[in-house]
Amino acid sequence: MQAFVNRLWYPKGFLDTQSKGLFLLLKIIQLLLLPLSLLFAAITALRRSLFKIGIKKQSRLPVPVIVVGNITVGGSGKTPTVIYLVELLRRHGYQPGVISRGYGVNFEGVRSVLPSMAARDVGDEPAMIVGRTGVPMVIGRNRIDAGEHLLTHFNVDVIISDDGLQHYALGRDIELLILDGDRRFGNGSLLPAGPLREGLWRVKKVDAVVVNGGQSIEGEHAMSLVPSALKPVTHSNEQPPALNDAVVAIAGIGNPQRFFTSLINAGFNLNGVKAFEDHQAYCEEELTELCGDLPIIMTEKDAVKCRDFAKQNWWYLPVDAKLSSNFDRLILDKLKR
């Protein structure tokens, strides 16, 4: 199902492989869904307008808030961007904290994220962010409550709201829109005919557009994800696989093909690949059956969910976001205002 949706939403990535019949079918489906997309567009625009004119209340926290988000469904590089911001702010004397929804975790109220907590209790992305940086972090459906809890229990002077672009109840000082440079805005339609959560007009309202890979255009900030050495998912005495060794690659992220392509470009010998749903909950039996005795290479986001049952020949590939000094100055200058 997800593969079919990707062909509908991101047709440019499949032009070389799909038949004329399939292309026509996708166009018909898109046209049939357009009335629902128009309704969705009206609802989202009305909702934002209600906050803008004050009918719906927007609450501000007593510290600057940086919102990191996107207007497309699926992965774009928000988590590496959040980690980059945490490290940037710390280098310049700030004490950042992070708030997030905690996707896939059902609980009431808010919850502090600690490095010792399992991904199933806080969400894979919060577990990854805190595991990498140790930053104070609170998750909760209500971002205002999460922010207030963060300020009450931790020494924080700037808050990063992960995936918070559409959470208009929380006031913000800086808005960052993260965009997959290969997929960009897909077919340009709103849900369900396309991948957009909001119209393209939203791009002009943010403080900066960060483009992850692909081609950026004038006014956008190019970001690259730089891989480092393989790391074991759990404690291991084994050596990581060499480039000519056969491995199996898995990814449960918004754009798994980007990860597989990065491994191929790095020279790894992929004996098999398996793309899972974003935020996939893994089990030992499934992955063991998939790879047999071969090493597995996965993303860091996947690794935080596999540590309790990982084999010694399971590895993950850390990546670090790289942005320009112009982007750094933009963030720091806006915080000083």
Curated annotation (Swiss-Prot):
Give the molecular function GO annotations.
Answer: ATP binding; tetraacyldisaccharide 4'-kinase activity
Keywords from the named record: ATP-binding, Kinase, Lipid A biosynthesis, Lipid biosynthesis, Lipid metabolism, Nucleotide-binding, Transferase
Q: Which GO terms describe its cellular component?
A: plasma membrane
Tell me the Gene Ontology biological-process terms attached to this UniProt entry. Answer: lipid A biosynthetic process; lipopolysaccharide core region biosynthetic process
* Reactions it catalyzes: a lipid A disaccharide + ATP = a lipid IVA + ADP + H(+)
Q: Check the record and name the InterPro entries matching this protein.
A: LpxK, P-loop_NTPase
What's the EC number here? 2.7.1.130
Q: What class of enzyme is it?
A: transferase
Disulfide pattern: none
The answer to whether the entry has keyword Lipid metabolism is yes
Q: Which residues bind ATP?
A: T72, V73, G74, G75, S76, G77, K78, T79
**Pathway annotation from the record:** Glycolipid biosynthesis; lipid IV(A) biosynthesis; lipid IV(A) from (3R)-3-hydroxytetradecanoyl-[acyl-carrier-protein] and UDP-N-acetyl-alpha-D-glucosamine: step 6/6
**One of this protein's Pfam families, by short name?**
LpxK
Q: Which family does it belong to?
A: Belongs to the LpxK family.
Explain the purpose of this protein: Transfers the gamma-phosphate of ATP to the 4'-position of a tetraacyldisaccharide 1-phosphate intermediate (termed DS-1-P) to form tetraacyldisaccharide 1,4'-bis-phosphate (lipid IVA).
Q: What is this protein called?
A: Tetraacyldisaccharide 4'-kinase
Task: Give the organism the record lists.
Answer: Shewanella sediminis (strain HAW-EB3)
Q: Which gene encodes it?
A: lpxK
